[in-house]
Amino acid sequence: MNKPLRNSHPLFKIANNALVDLPAPINISSWWNFGSLLGLCLIIQILTGLFLAMHYTADINLAFYSVNHICRDVNYGWLLRTLHANGASFFFICIYLHVGRGIYYGSYMFTPTWLIGVIILFLVMGTAFMGYVLPWGQMSFWGATVITNLLSAIPYLGMDLVQWLWGGFAVDNATLTRFFTFHFILPFIVLAMTMIHLLFLHQTGSNNPIGLNSNIDKIPFHPYFTFKDIVGFIVMIFILISLVLISPNLLGDPDNFIPANPLVTPAHIQPEWYFLFAYAILRSIPNKLGGVIALVLSIAILMILPFYNLSKFRGIQFYPINQVMFWSMLVTVILLTWIGARPVEEPYVLIGQILTVVYFLYYLVNPLITKWWDNLLN
């Protein structure tokens, strides 16, 4: 009997097994839409970024004006730029919801998938940071100076490392050129890592909202989840385009409309909104090296979840106290985001320190509470 081409062609077979005939749990909710939304975000970012790179000039005397030229003189350049800048925000909204879903439903028990996911998160954060430097406005320059300077906290190697990264004794033309190079190449590395992420996920199959084995009750990915994903695409693209066409600079920093000036420091240096929670954690530790360690750990701590799971059930659907803790942690992250945008003065410093302790305690206490709850029900 003749097989359909998608089952016989060596190339189509790979795509078919990942996107068409993939057995998917029948009961996965809309929280499982964010993986495909992240894929869409990545494609949007790569395409808009590619066209922006055709008109951008990575030179400290020209970068700011080349971005200005893109917005004023290039056909639909303003649309490309605002889509790219706001697309990054939507990328992070989706990635944080995706991670939150993984924590809530215990998806971190797919250990290799989870660990690669955390590495992808680090890569995306690095890409976004370097992209923020490229327009060479005030916040670009000072953000780059402050964040790259953190490497100087590394004992013995610190200062040499920073100067090696800068390509000189300060953030200068060499820094901008290499940041542009890395900003261009990293999304393709993220794309490759995403393929590996999916490869490992498809070894085990998807998790589902009740955390039980769903092998006895699966349906093909297409048409059921392709259409469900398309609904998600339409909603996200609608919100993104609405933001881009109504208020494209809502999430940006006004200081970045001023060309970079090494002689004038902005009153308040801060990164884009999606890094503010980590920035608040960095600032809440009075010691420089301690702050850098806390900053890295704020994301890296996600890697301990698969190895520190003490519960009998997968996820926290069946653990009421843990659910309260989870939503409290979400509020903590939102408050940290707010603190990151505030000046370094009381009461903000103290609030930031308390929230930082609460943030890290969640990851340490959460498994213990599940264990206690299991013992209670025995």
Swiss-Prot record:
It is a multi-pass membrane protein. Component of the ubiquinol-cytochrome c reductase complex (complex III or cytochrome b-c1 complex) that is part of the mitochondrial respiratory chain. The b-c1 complex mediates electron transfer from ubiquinol to cytochrome c. Contributes to the generation of a proton gradient across the mitochondrial membrane that is then used for ATP synthesis. Heme b b566 binds at H98, H197. The gene is mt:Cyt-b. Changing V357I: In strain: NC37, NC48, TT00, TT01, HW00 and HW09. Keywords: Electron transport, Heme, Iron, Membrane, Metal-binding, Mitochondrion, Mitochondrion inner membrane, Respiratory chain, Transmembrane, Transmembrane helix, Transport, Ubiquinone. Heme b b562 binds at H84, H183. Binds 2 heme b groups non-covalently. Its main location: mitochondrion. Changing T370M: In strain: NC37. Its cofactor is heme b. It is found in: Mitochondrion inner membrane. The main subunits of complex b-c1 are: cytochrome b, cytochrome c1 and the Rieske protein. GO terms for biological process: mitochondrial electron transport, ubiquinol to cytochrome c. Coiled coil: none annotated. Heme 1 (or BL or b562) is low-potential and absorbs at about 562 nm, and heme 2 (or BH or b566) is high-potential and absorbs at about 566 nm. Belongs to the cytochrome b family. GO terms for molecular function: metal ion binding; ubiquinol-cytochrome-c reductase activity. The chain crosses the membrane at residues 34-54, 78-99, 114-134, 179-199, 227-247, 289-309, 321-341, 348-368. It comes from Drosophila simulans. This is Cytochrome b. It comes from the Eukaryota. The keyword Transmembrane applies. One of its GO terms (cellular component) is mitochondrial inner membrane.
